[in-house]
């Protein structure tokens, strides 16, 4: 009898202990199959590793440390952005960015590189929130690319250019570079918004970027062709050659769906062509920054007389590129909001 009373009393205490306690929450599901997300989020030949939509923001930040099909894209550019911050700290110890007017383009290219890398990392991390945020974050990504394009053009024009090429293009180079950077952003945003399939969509996105790259890299290519100095006397040339090779490799993987098309269903986490594109683009950026830094240090006797008088305010053009690209992305985001609102009616 006493034993039965004790057991009932123990059961009562246990029940009281659990009163008011929340039941244990199940672990969130971080990835789902492609069939469980809208077609907007689908990647060719990638059938799993997608993140569910309409979770809270904390969920998507937590996926930074989870396995999903955007994780490598996030980390490649996030780590590179952190490396650039360390590089900038190192440069600040030896370069007087405040007092040396010729150091400003060097600061701009580091800032522009950090901008595109960080915007890209944020876009790939948070774009799965919803259809609206998918569009908006990739529009932000395209703004970063436009800023980087103009920053690259400025650095090449200021430090890498040969006097003979400078004489030919000085009046039009930077304004044209700013226009093409904006056009690249606008074309990419419009292609994303319109979702045009096939060749036409690729033309909207890739043709302006290709034109911008041809102009932006022209001082480097001209110098590689005409430079009489051997590589050991001009070490920046090796880095410039590397950045060209890395960019072309990056462009090849961006424009195709290799290698996932060779192994359908096997590249959910690793091995996607866009991941390889990210890696080569990071290598291109790092090689470019080393080349530009070496040019800043070693070619002052060449670039200082060339830029004694400026036909254009490059700081103003830089800000114009940032502002026009940002406004374009904002406008397209509002068009997306309207389109999605009409779809839900």
Curated annotation (Swiss-Prot):
What is the scientific name of the source organism?
A: Mus musculus (Mouse)
For this entry, the protein name equals Membrane progestin receptor alpha
Q: Which residues cross the membrane?
A: 75-95, 103-123, 137-157, 169-189, 244-264, 269-289, 316-336
Per the record, the coiled-coil ranges are none
What does its record list under induction? Up-regulated in PPAR gamma 1-induced adipogenic liver.
Q: Where in the cell is it found?
A: Cell membrane
Q: What is this protein's function?
A: Plasma membrane progesterone (P4) receptor coupled to G proteins. Seems to act through a G(i) mediated pathway. May be involved in oocyte maturation. Involved in neurosteroid inhibition of apoptosis. Also binds dehydroepiandrosterone (DHEA), pregnanolone, pregnenolone and allopregnanolone.
For side Extracellular, which residue ranges? 96-102, 158-168, 265-268, 337-345
Primary localization class, coarse: membrane
């Amino acid at each position: 009898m006493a034993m039965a009373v004790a057991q009932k009393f123990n059961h009562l205490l246990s029940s009281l202990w659990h009163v008011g306690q929340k039941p244990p929450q199940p672990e969130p599901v971080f990835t789902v199959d492609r069939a469980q997300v809208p077609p907007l989020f689908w990647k060719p030949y990638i059938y799993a590793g997608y993140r569910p939509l309409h979770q809270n923001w904390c969920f998507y930040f937590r996926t930074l440390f989870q396995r999903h099909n955007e994780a490598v894209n996030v980390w490649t550019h996030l780590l590179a952005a952190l490396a650039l911050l360390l590089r900038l700290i190192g440069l600040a110890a030896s370069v007087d960015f405040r007092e040396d007017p010729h150091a400003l383009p060097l600061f701009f290219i580091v800032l522009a590189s950090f901008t595109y890398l960080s915007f890209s990392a944020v876009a790939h991390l948070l774009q799965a929130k919803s259809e609206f945020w998918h569009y908006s974050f990739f529009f932000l990504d395209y703004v970063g690319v436009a800023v980087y394009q103009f920053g690259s053009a400025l650095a090449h024009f200021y430090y890498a250019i040969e006097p003979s090429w400078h004489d030919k293009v000085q009046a039009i180079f930077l304004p044209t570079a700013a226009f093409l950077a904006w056009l690249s952003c606008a074309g990419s945003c419009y292609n994303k918004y319109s979702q045009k399939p096939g060749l036409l969509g690729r033309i909207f996105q890739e043709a302006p970027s290709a034109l911008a790259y041809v102009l932006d890299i022209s001082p480097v290519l001209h110098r590689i062709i005409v430079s009489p100095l051997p590589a050991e006397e001009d070490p920046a040339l090796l880095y410039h050659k590397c950045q060209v090779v890395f960019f072309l490799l990056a462009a090849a993987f961006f424009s195709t769906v290799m290698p996932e098309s060779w192994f359908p269903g096997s590249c959910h986490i690793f091995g996607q062509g866009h991941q390889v594109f990210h890696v080569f683009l990071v290598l291109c950026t790092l090689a470019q920054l080393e080349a530009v830094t070496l040019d800043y240090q070693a070619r002052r006797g060449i670039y200082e007389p060339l830029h004694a008088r400026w036909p254009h305010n490059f700081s103003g053009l830089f800000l114009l590129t940032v502002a026009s690209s940002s406004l374009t992305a904002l406008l397209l985001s509002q068009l997306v909001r309207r389109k999605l609102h009409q779809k839900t009616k």
